Amino acid sequence: MRFIVIAIAFVALAGCQKQTQQAPASNQAAPAAEAGPVKGVDRSHRGQPAPAAEFNNPDGGEISLAKFKGVPVLVNLWASWCAPCVKELPTLDKLAQTHDVDGALGVVAVSQDSGPQPSVVAFLKKLNVKDLGAYHDPNMALSGALGPDVVLPTSILIGADGKEVWRYVGDLDWTSPEAAKLLAEAKPAGKG
């Protein structure tokens, strides 16, 4: 009896195997492969308000991007386990060092690590990152509010009006001429 049950199960499972797809005829287009986010600038969200999601500020209190309205801000989503994220952190730190001082651009790098905030502080210290605050979003509320297609690293430029200008998917040298050109698209409040 046991053999019969196993044989029936085998036959049933064999009928459930994925069927191979026939090649399309020469006059038919092949199905498009699903593409994930491509590295580079994405302007498809331009003009959307910054999400209201809250995350932790460097002191451990809650904050949202509304706190930065009136000043353009570059928001970077990163994690310690993400090699491209770690690669670009020093250039974000240098950007924060040169731009946060004059109020022309805020730089907010938000860790997506699930561990406690002190581990984010220790990680940044280990990298000798001094000018980026240890913003932390262990529940990934901010990345979730930005949409299901957000990958790490992703940087979002929010204008002084609180609306998205662009997203940059992937790592970038934020001290490069390419980055300077992109960042120039954000005009501080009151500066034409």
Outline where the language-model segments fall:
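Short active-site neighborhood of thiol/selenol oxidoreductases, capturing the structured segment around
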Residues: S64-V86
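Short, ordered coil/turn segments that flank beta-strands lining enzyme active or ligand-binding pockets
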Residues: P58-D59, A160
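N-terminal targeting signals for export/organelle localization
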Residues: M1-A52, K191-G192
